[in-house]
Amino acid sequence: TSYHLVGYGSYYIINDEGKNMPEDKIVSHAKVGIIGGGIMGVSLLYHLAKEGWKDLVLLEKGELTSGSTWHAAGQCPQMMGSYNLAKIHLESTNLYKKLEKETEQPTGFHDCGSLRLAYKKEDLDWFKYVKGILDNVGAPAEIISTNEIKKIHPFIKLDGIIGAFHTPEDGHTDPTSTTNAMAKGARNHG
């Protein structure tokens, strides 16, 4: 098994025995070791580097994003039923919006917005609950009428629909590109 180590803005490749590299180039210790080069591990590396941490190493047994990240859908919804998740999703979306400019590395992020349709009063009650959470974290959201739905998406057939939950900053990103942009950002931050 080979391991790829990303640290100090460098990319090292070694095998289990530590071969393939001169001994003086192999990282033997670090303040923080992050296992896994998917979007979560690289995000942690990026954020720590951005906060000024220097003694960081990321270990990945394959290539960056070679696990579940490369085939993830990359959806970035704001509609969450818990405060903590809503805050995380908002922070992630805000990061994806500025990451490409910061790193000059494409992320594939598109903020296209979304609509969740209500067919019964209970749906609208749930939307009101979630809107309270999103208002609290600062994520834009609104409960809209069928007339407003038609303005946003004129091709939706409105039979049985009584309203919708509109989150205009929902989007999607390319997980592999976003991960690579965060890896570049981590290198840029030292």
Residues of each region from the PLM?
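Dinucleotide-binding Rossmann-like beta1-alpha1 core, especially the glycine-rich loop
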Residues: 74-152
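A short, basic/flexible loop-to-alpha-helix module at the beginning of a structural domain
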Residues: 16-29
